[in-house]
Amino acid sequence: MKRGKNYQQAGEKFDRLTLYEPKEALELVKEIAKAKFDETVEVHIKLGVDPRHADQQVRGTVSLPNGTGKTRKVLVFAKGEKIKEAELAGADYVGGEDLAEKIQGGWFDFDVAVATPDMMAVVGKMGKILGPRGLMPNPKAGTVTFDIERTIKELKAGRIEYRVDKSAIVHAPIGRISFEVDKLQENLNAFAEALLKARPAAAKGQYMRSVTVCSTMSPGVKINPLVLMAANK
């Protein structure tokens, strides 16, 4: 894959093999970001698990103390009094069969979907459509619930879902380039702490094998995983 001039120049400003302290790595990411938009800052953590085994799955949610910097559009499948609750809590779209029909027609103008348990008969039919896009409501992610008000407010405030992929890597946004380094570090620590708490009992050896932070358009800066784990025990 051919990289642009800015990407190549950014990679010359630091040692790609060095394992940096978390704060120093985030400072470097901010320094080398040159895009003309407010890039997302991401973290990618390789875990010492084998995702092929059910007892080594890592999945959950975490509320980032400083949010992600992105305004998320929340869609809610609900009926009865829960419709009003969702609207008052700030949901962008609320409905039932009407929303299902729009989605089946190719509409996806939302970032996260929430459903009350009594709407899963409707939502379940769209598993093959929503699932591959990461939009399917799921009890483990806290998006199938009757506690609509709290869930919407948490999602709007910066609650994110994470899940280990087939390569045993977990990916997450931890803010924007415009965030102060301390705010990014607080979000990184919150995410790392959540991952440590979610460690499967079956995981063996060093849990965090590698940690990389980057912005949307910049190369990754490596963080010493042992330092990050020690700071968030």
Swiss-Prot record:
SUPFAM superfamilies: Ribosomal protein L1
GO-annotated biological processes: regulation of translation; translation
Similarity comment: family membership: Belongs to the universal ribosomal protein uL1 family.
Organism (species): Syntrophomonas wolfei subsp. wolfei (strain DSM 2245B / Goettingen)
Function: Binds directly to 23S rRNA. The L1 stalk is quite mobile in the ribosome, and is involved in E site tRNA release. Protein L1 is also a translational repressor protein, it controls the translation of the L11 operon by binding to its mRNA.
The encoding gene: rplA
HAMAP family reported for this sequence: Ribosomal_uL1_B
One Pfam family hit: Ribosomal_L1
Stated name of the protein: Large ribosomal subunit protein uL1
